[in-house]
């Protein structure tokens, strides 16, 4: 609770929450009148966790730049929309600190790899249907790919799924790695994080 109380009700408080977290993980004191000034994080080790800001907007980039911490753009959340602008803002307004004298950037992408392109696309069917409904505000469970592929999509839905497939990081491991590395190079990225979900984790 102390890390992020009422997060959805007070987004303007986010900078203060980041400041508090940085103090707790480093073992430094908060202001005396702070409601959690007596709270300490345990155990305290010889090293300090590295704090990143994961965001999909300019606001997150500005916060990361202000505190001098690494910034990771949530590519998987927006399909990259806004990434270039957010990364530019972060780099241009970055305030150096001892641990990070220079801006340090990342991208978090959704990817799925398999032994063949066909197998990867088959398993992607689960996400394709899930995402189609998510964009309508309907959150379905991840279905088996065979069931998802058999769903009677309309022509417009099929068109949307085809567009999604064209930009998704899906295929053989070699193909997906090449796509992600090219993306990182295009945007001057230091690190890549990958998220994946499928109906069967052993697929």
Predicted regions and their residues:
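Acidic/polar active-site rim loop that often engages polyanionic ligands
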Residues: 1-6, 68
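An alpha-helical appendage that flanks or caps ligand/catalytic pockets
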Residues: 5-40, 81-187
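Aromatic-rich, solvent-exposed beta-strand/loop patch
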Residues: 38-48
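Hydrophobic faces of well-ordered beta-strands that scaffold small-molecule active sites
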Residues: 49-54, 69-74, 103-110, 190-194
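Short beta->alpha connector loops
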Residues: 55-58, 175
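A conserved active-site cap/scaffold subdomain adjacent to cofactor or substrate pockets
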Residues: 57-81, 86-87, 100
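Flexible loop/turn segments at secondary-structure boundaries
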Residues: 60-61, 80-81, 113-116, 200-202
């Amino acid at each position: 609770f102390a890390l992020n109380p009422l997060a959805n009700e007070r987004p303007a408080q986010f900078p203060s929450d980041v400041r508090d977290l940085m103090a707790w993980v480093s073992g430094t004191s908060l202001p005396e009148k702070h409601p959690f000034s007596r709270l300490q994080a345990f155990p305290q080790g010889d090293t300090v966790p590295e704090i990143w800001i994961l965001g999909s907007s300019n606001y997150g980039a500005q916060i990361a730049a202000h505190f001098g911490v690494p910034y990771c753009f949530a590519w998987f959340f927006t399909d990259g929309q806004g990434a270039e602008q957010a990364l530019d803002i972060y780099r241009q307004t970055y305030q150096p600190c001892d641990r990070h004298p220079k801006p340090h950037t990342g991208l978090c992408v959704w990817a799925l790899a398999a032994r063949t392109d066909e197998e990867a696309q088959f398993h992607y069917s689960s996400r394709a249907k899930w995402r189609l409904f998510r964009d309508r505000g309907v959150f379905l469970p991840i279905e088996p790919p065979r069931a998802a592929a058999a769903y009677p999509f309309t022509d417009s839905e099929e068109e949307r799924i085809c567009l999604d497939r064209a930009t998704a990081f899906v295929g053989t491991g070699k193909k997906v790695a090449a796509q992600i590395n090219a993306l990182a190079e295009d945007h001057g990225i230091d690190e890549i994080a990958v998220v994946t979900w499928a109906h069967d984790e052993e697929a």
